Amino acid sequence: MTKNGDDDKEALPIWLSKAADRIVGHMNSDHSNSIVSTLHAQFGVKDLGARMERLKVDGYYISSDKNLYFAKFTRKCSSVDEYREELIKHAQIYRKFEIP
């Protein structure tokens, strides 16, 4: 679902708040293909310029063409390790949606 992001500003748990900038920076610089694939798989949107923007415990927001899309995880995470596992899961299951 496309969201404008303004209506969904719940506070992050401390563990995610502390790690958010690092996770977002790492994903955008080293794993942008996974973000692009997730956007394509979950929303049918093909955008090589898609970027991870904001995190929540059950997923993250992807920006694409001035829209925000919420990429949902299969569960709510309660630690950085669980968050990493969900990101890896997305990379694995959505690999077939990579855009050449």
Q: What are these regions, as identified by a protein language model?
A:
Residues M1-P100:
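Binding-site signature for planar aromatic cofactors or substrates
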